[in-house]
Amino acid sequence: MTNRLSESSTPPRWGMVVDVNRCVGCQTCTVACKHWNDTQPGVQWRSVIDVETGRYPNVERFFLVVGCQHCAVPPCVPVCPTGATQQRDDGLVTMNYDSCIGCAACAVACPYDARTIAHEHQWYYGTETLQEESARHPEREGVAQKCTFCVDKVDEATSRQLDPGVDFDVMPACAASCISNAISFGDFNNPTSNVSTLVHDQPTIRLNEDLGTDPQIKYLYSTPTVPGRDADADDLDEKHQSDPTNPLVGKRQNFWDWRATMNWCLGGLGSGLAVSAWIAYVIGQISMQATHQLQLIAGVMMLAGLFFVWLKLGRRWRAWRALWRPQTSWMSRELYAAGVFLISVLVTTQISQPVVGLYHLAGFAATCFLLCQARILHSAKGIPAWRTPRVPWLIVVSGLFEGVGLTLLLVSTNVVSNDGTFYLDPSKLAGVMVTLAVLNMILWLGYRYGADRAARPPLANRIVDNMSWPLLIVGHLAPVLLALAAWFHAADTSALLATAGFLVIAGGTFWKCGLILKASYQHGFTLSRLPQRGSGTRAAPSLVA
């Protein structure tokens, strides 16, 4: 046995080295992982993807071991609203299943598709067996789960003063079982460890290095006789990146469905209404009573959006735990903002004398809520269409645009009575409508054609392109024309403004649903260099010669 403490640094930095040229794609590591961790059908903590490209005889094939990368800068940790996803001092990113609520914030933040949420237990043969029942982990159902580098083995190694990179009985299951010695585990902080020696002597690559996550699985891709190569135009062309059969191309996320989307549709609309009403009140365009009426309606919509999110949670009765991490999680901050807003509105309802400060507090809280929604989506580092710089601006401006649209709809249809203090004249409302429509159009066109386009995968760009014309015509141009018609129309403009408001809301709902449900392709796997394991022009230079 090896004394780990005598050789490694303190604290260690555990990681893996995978030799792509050694991996034969036998899947022994995936089976060993499933056996040791007792994962149910459909749950893969460790996977081996088969990458085959080209056309005969110029073909190339290699195998890539993937899973949680235990990043030094893990994007999954700060987004977790409960603190269930944690990073230890030794670098391991672990899960506390008892704290997780199954919100999937970590899953969409992970750019390596490493997390799974199994809402119901599945059996390998369709019915329960004694062995599966004895190995069942009910604490993992409805919550996020992923590779832990067999943390139980690592901790056992520490307690027994062994080296999990050398001693097989405490080595992670995938590394211990690899038949070709392609997977090595060890301490990157120890310069004499097996993994440090491997990466010191040979060139390595890491998955999705451009994202700045500093993943701790490093891949050897080159040997003296079979040198690696740079990714070429064929690897990066749009056709290759749009091929759904390409295992390196990200699949559409299924963690956040229509229920989660309703939070952005209803919550964004409600908070936009509250912020718009607050601004109008501050500049003297609507009365205190009218402001309160609109805030009540906004509160109902925000609550409805949060209710749909609650329905999406894997562990709904733990939802209160989402208040635990306001220091890092925008989801936690969103709940606090909603709480402040709702309490302010309810207190205003109960007191006999209006308190101006409560109206301002509610308006400020609604603004924070809208900003939190923008940042929640932007923090999803695993979804390129969400993490681009214009997305937060789109969420905020669209929320205000929809809020003005809803105000027009409510007033024009007499849902909220117009006592003459809602606005000075129709021309001002039309001006606000046109201004926000133009600003939103500029942001959307920038999102579609600007630098954001290059940051999105081609499959997501197709969705964005298909959404653009309906969105611009129905959600922007038509409301602008109706608002301008109301501007110049001397007679009753209620029908024009109500229709314009409805179209604005419809447009906002359309693009949010499209962005969250349709354009939400995961990042996939990006390799800056690749091994040359092929034939014809794809063969290594030394073999061609």
Role assignments for model-derived ranges:
Residues 519-545:
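Short, highly charged, low-complexity non-transmembrane loops/tails of multi-pass membrane proteins
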Residues 1-257, 265, 276-282, 300:
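Non-ligating segments of multi-cofactor redox enzymes
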Residues 89-93, 123-126, 161, 166, ...:
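Iron-sulfur-associated redox domains of electron-transfer enzymes in respiratory
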